[in-house]
UniProtKB/Swiss-Prot annotation:
GO process annotations (BP): L-methionine salvage from methylthioadenosine
Catalytic activity, as annotated: 5-methylsulfanyl-2,3-dioxopentyl phosphate + H2O = 1,2-dihydroxy-5-(methylsulfanyl)pent-1-en-3-one + phosphate
Pathway(s) the chain acts in: Amino-acid biosynthesis; L-methionine biosynthesis via salvage pathway; L-methionine from S-methyl-5-thio-alpha-D-ribose 1-phosphate: step 3/6; Amino-acid biosynthesis; L-methionine biosynthesis via salvage pathway; L-methionine from S-methyl-5-thio-alpha-D-ribose 1-phosphate: step 4/6
Name of protein: Enolase-phosphatase E1
Protein origin, superkingdom: Bacteria
Family to which the UniProt record says this protein belongs: Belongs to the HAD-like hydrolase superfamily. MasA/MtnC family.
SUPFAM superfamilies registered for this protein in UniProt: HAD-like
InterPro entries reported in the protein's UniProt record: Enolase-ppase_E1 (IPR023943), HAD-like_sf (IPR036412), HAD-SF_hydro_IA (IPR006439), HAD_sf (IPR023214)
GO terms for MF: 2,3-diketo-5-methylthiopentyl-1-phosphate enolase activity; 2-hydroxy-3-keto-5-methylthiopentenyl-1-phosphate phosphatase activity; acireductone synthase activity; magnesium ion binding
UniProt subunit comment: Monomer.
Species for this entry: Bradyrhizobium sp. (strain BTAi1 / ATCC BAA-1182)
The protein's required cofactors: Mg(2+)
Length: 230
């Protein structure tokens, strides 16, 4: 049975929603963990790296910055300096051909369908904007950057806070009720719904169902009707 919604803008999470959570956790996180210390040591003096380390030091007190970064990654903390450094490390892996990013086939078909219908597509992820762009540039389906109209990371606010979604709506220039947000995370859906955004729970793999939200297991069951408001 199709889920039919009116929409002006599409907002999407990445991990667990349009891409495999295991790719991010096993491949990308594994790559950055194994290389973090050497990557930082080889780039001391790089202004961006030094700014990241200063931010880490301010947050971690007397803890060694690399040790703090590794601990944050192991705990899957969504901390901005960690996300920025991960993006830099992952960029080197993409460019060296160490891996290509994953995207679900059904999600990619739907994204192209939404785009062809005139719906702008935006990403909201805890990964840095830089890391998001790289993810879609080096995908298993080729360079997908042209699909997206913009990217948001936690610089705009936490993904579990309603104010973040209101800020995104304000930035895009769309009424929250005209935005449809897809995510696998109920806490994110709660926050978006509190801001007045239409939400859809994406249930892939081992993601548990949640009866509070409209739910899909395959993007082919979603029909978005593009109805621009004045």
């Amino acid at each position: 049975m199709a889920l039919v919604l009116d929409a002006e803008v599409v907002l999407l999470d990445i991990e667990g929603t349009i891409a495999s959570q295991s790719f991010v956790l096993d491949v990308l996180f594994g790559y950055s963990r194994a290389r973090m210390a050497d990557f930082v040591a080889a780039r001391r003096g790089d202004p961006e790296i030094e700014a990241i380390l200063a931010d880490v030091a301010a947050r971690a007190g007397g803890t060694d910055p690399v040790a703090a970064l590794l601990a944050w990654q192991d705990a899957d903390q969504k901390i901005p300096p960690l996300k920025k450094l991960q993006g830099r490390i992952w960029e080197s892996g993409y460019k060296e051909g160490a891996y290509v990013s994953h995207i679900y086939d059904d999600a990619l078909i739907a994204l192209r369908r939404f785009k062809a219908a005139g719906l702008p597509l935006y990403i909201f992820s805890s990964g840095s904007v830089q890391a998001q762009i790289q993810y879609f540039q080096f995908s298993s389906a080729g360079d997908l950057r042209s699909l997206f109209d913009g990217h948001f990371d936690t610089d705009i606010g936490a993904k579990v806070e309603a104010a973040s979604y209101q800020a995104i709506a304000d930035t895009i220039g769309a009424r929250p009720s005209r935005i449809v947000f897809f995510s696998d995370n109920p806490r994110e859906l709660e926050a978006a719904a509190a801001a007045g955004i239409v939400v859809v729970h994406v249930v892939k793999g081992n993601t548990p169902s949640d009866p509070r939200f409209p739910e899909i297991t395959d993007f082919s069951t979603v029909e978005l009707r593009h109805s621009k408001t004045e």
